[in-house]
From Swiss-Prot:
One GO cellular component term: extracellular region
Protein name: Dermonecrotic toxin SpeSicTox-betaIIA2ii
Class of this enzyme: lyase
Biological role: Dermonecrotic toxins cleave the phosphodiester linkage between the phosphate and headgroup of certain phospholipids (sphingolipid and lysolipid substrates), forming an alcohol (often choline) and a cyclic phosphate. This toxin acts on sphingomyelin (SM). It may also act on ceramide phosphoethanolamine (CPE), lysophosphatidylcholine (LPC) and lysophosphatidylethanolamine (LPE), but not on lysophosphatidylserine (LPS), and lysophosphatidylglycerol (LPG). It acts by transphosphatidylation, releasing exclusively cyclic phosphate products as second products.
Family, similarity comment: Belongs to the arthropod phospholipase D family. Class II subfamily.
Disulfide topology: 45-51, 47-190
Tissues in which the UniProt entry reports expression: Expressed by the venom gland.
GO molecular function: lyase activity; metal ion binding; phosphoric diester hydrolase activity; toxin activity
Domain of life: Eukaryota
Reactions that this protein is recorded to catalyse: an N-(acyl)-sphingosylphosphocholine = an N-(acyl)-sphingosyl-1,3-cyclic phosphate + choline; an N-(acyl)-sphingosylphosphoethanolamine = an N-(acyl)-sphingosyl-1,3-cyclic phosphate + ethanolamine; a 1-acyl-sn-glycero-3-phosphocholine = a 1-acyl-sn-glycero-2,3-cyclic phosphate + choline; a 1-acyl-sn-glycero-3-phosphoethanolamine = a 1-acyl-sn-glycero-2,3-cyclic phosphate + ethanolamine
Keyword Magnesium appears in the UniProt entry: yes
Positions of Mg(2+) binding: 25, 27, 85
Length: 275
């Protein structure tokens, strides 16, 4: 999975897909009551990027629905995963539940269309800190109450704050979640980051019977040398401001027979097992 990073304006969706991304990550900004208002990062953000691009959240969902609905004139078959970077750290933890209800409802109304020809992409809920775990509970509660639990099959969870992996597992256990789990490791592209935690996450993913990590990705990678380093370790995905650089690295002899781009036929919730 090549995840385009900080794809917050509607016109950027096709721009990043044209560069080779098959997944996009966008920031979801909330008001003080936990209502998802905009796809917006704000200042500061990654080096060399404009931090202020944005869209109204519901309008953004309407657009990506079209891009991920077969038969729609805007359909792009390569876009298979949407990662929602939920800016919950900007609001009180007490509002995490309200935020979960709101995001689930807006996805039902504007993306899935409650079963009426909605978008087909997989959804990854990127949660910054384990203390905001009530968001997940609320999201699942809302799908159940609205009679649309079938969409759980399309939804995964990912804690992105580089917290202790065992702490993350404990929170997932508390929530009763042991599938559809991704693990991110990374830092803004402005700073270097070692591989210690990334290696631990990959080790857990590859431990037989370990349920709490099915995919691991590194973010936000801009240098080809760091992309190569991550691929050598065996990551499932790379988040980048420059998807075209990842595409180029994947074509190199060292990687071309080991990796390929994920398509809609690839299940993002299953551990990859080499044949």
């Amino acid at each position: 999975w090549i995840m385009g990073h900080m794809v917050n304006a509607i016109e950027q969706v096709d721009e990043f897909l044209d560069l080779g991304a098959n997944a996009i990550e966008f920031d979801v900004d909330f008001d003080d009551d936990g209502v998802a208002k905009y796809t917006h990062h704000g200042i500061p953000c990654d080096c060399g990027r404009l931090c202020t691009k944005y869209a109204v959240f519901t309008e953004y969902l309407d657009y990506v629905r079209q891009v991920t609905t077969p038969g729609d004139p805007k359909f792009r078959k390569e876009l298979v995963l949407l990662a929602l970077d939920l800016k919950l750290q900007r609001i009180s933890s007490e509002k995490a539940y309200a935020a979960g209800v709101d995001v689930a409802t807006k996805l039902l109304d504007h993306y899935w269309m409650r079963g009426w020809n909605g978008g087909r992409a997989y959804i990854l809920l990127n949660i910054p800190l384990v203390e905001d775990y009530e968001f997940i509970r609320a999201f699942k509660d809302t799908l159940r109450k609205e009679g649309h639990e079938q969409y759980n099959a399309k939804v995964g969870i990912n804690f992105t704050g580089n917290e202790d992996l065992d702490e993350i597992r404990e929170v997932l256990e508390k929530l009763g979640e042991d599938e559809h789990i991704w693990q991110a490791d990374g830092i803004t592209s402005c700073f270097p980051r070692g591989t210690e935690r990334l290696k631990k996450a990959l080790e857990k993913r590859d431990t037989p019977g370990y349920k709490y990590i099915s995919k691991v990705y590194a973010w936000t990678l801009v240098r080809s040398s760091i992309m190569r380093r991550s691929l050598r370790l065996g990551v499932d995905g790379v988040m980048s401001n420059y998807p075209d650089r990842v595409v180029k690295v994947l074509k190199e002899k060292e990687f071309s027979d080991k990796f390929r781009l994920a398509t809609y036929a690839d299940n993002p919730w299953e551990k990859f097992t080499p044949i």
